[in-house]
């Protein structure tokens, strides 16, 4: 790690100890040349910036390991909190499945999912149940942030305080860190740096162009050439004399960036936002708050749907009204007799439907009622009315049926009903 104090002391040592340069050899001379290059390049960028620090004077002095110092450091109160520690009891397959569910279903990233698992002491069931209770913090760099960074970089180059105006929720340290990770995904010839210098030269003029190229890194201004066209550069020719304008059409096509589908960014909107720092901060903060609010709504809807799905997994049997299981009763009350006649008027000879209407009488008992109480309630006339409305069917071909009597279902009737049934029973004629 390069410390700031060591860097400052290294600068002073490189400038003031010119008389003692023999002991350092060519390293000190090389470091002085790098200092000159960094000072010239920092004139174009922000104050405090510079080139690469190369040389012995820029290296940190690593002290010897001291157990007492290490012990005192571990006993500090402001130590960081451990968020994940692997456990041998959890297999890799289960861990991958847990992370996949946390990512796809709940929107967690890997670090957040593992932190939740570590909080519950590597209990996957408890962790999965607790994932619904929290809304994961959104990713630090979303797709929208990356597109805005590319657009801001195309306008302002490596002037990070201007880029911050378009991304007010990002610190300059975060912008610089993302810039170097983003830079690695681009061409090795540093197309971004060349594009940034081209934009700055167009704004500041040719005078600043010479000043910038003198302090730039030779690796950054190297242009892409075919392998057969590459030749060694003579010592007298300096790299800054190489011009980038040899392929203007290719540079224009290379500089074009298209945002993802569904996103657009007009130059008028960017200029309006960049005109005033306060206005840009307010507008972007409102948009960011709306985005976070929408994400929270989506997460709440997901949690609600998941809760409903869990409730429906057991089926609807728990919510179904339990039907009172009524036992069949052999006695016919007055209300049941009238209800049976009305059911015959409505359903005809559909004994099953009549049994369902009455509730506590079986199909056999309904058939017995049909035969026993035929004359008493004038059931034949009721059937004729039903047939007049619905027509005569195959089921209604016979007007009489014998009562079904089973020994195990023998019916004990009251004296009154038994006497009435004996008088009313009729048997079909021999014809």
From Swiss-Prot:
Residues 17-28 have a biased composition (Polar residues). Gene3D superfamilies: 1.20.58.1880, 4.10.1240.50, Homeodomain-like (1.10.10.60). Residues 50-135 form the ELM2 domain. CDD domains: SANT (cd00167). GO terms for molecular function: transcription corepressor activity. It is found in: Nucleus. One of its GO terms (biological process) is negative regulation of DNA-templated transcription. Expressed in territories in which neurogenesis takes place. Residues 29-42 have a biased composition (Low complexity). Residues 1-10, 224-242 have a biased composition (Basic and acidic residues). Keywords: Chromatin regulator, Coiled coil, Nucleus, Repeat, Repressor, Transcription, Transcription regulation. One of its GO terms (cellular component) is transcription regulator complex. SMART domains: ELM2, SANT. Residues 267-314 form a coiled coil. Its main location: nucleus. Residues 1-53, 190-262 are annotated as: Disordered. InterPro entries: ELM2_dom, Homeodomain-like_sf, REST_helical, SANT/Myb, SANT_dom, Trans_reg/Corepressor. SUPFAM superfamilies: Homeodomain-like. Residues 136-187, 327-378 form the SANT domain. Component of a BHC histone deacetylase complex that contains KDM1A. Belongs to the CoREST family. Essential component of the BHC complex, a corepressor complex that represses transcription of neuron-specific genes in non-neuronal cells. The BHC complex is recruited at RE1/NRSE sites by REST and acts by deacetylating and demethylating specific sites on histones, thereby acting as a chromatin modifier. In the BHC complex, it serves as a molecular beacon for the recruitment of molecular machinery that imposes silencing across a chromosomal interval. This is REST corepressor 1. It comes from Xenopus laevis (African clawed frog). The gene is rcor1.
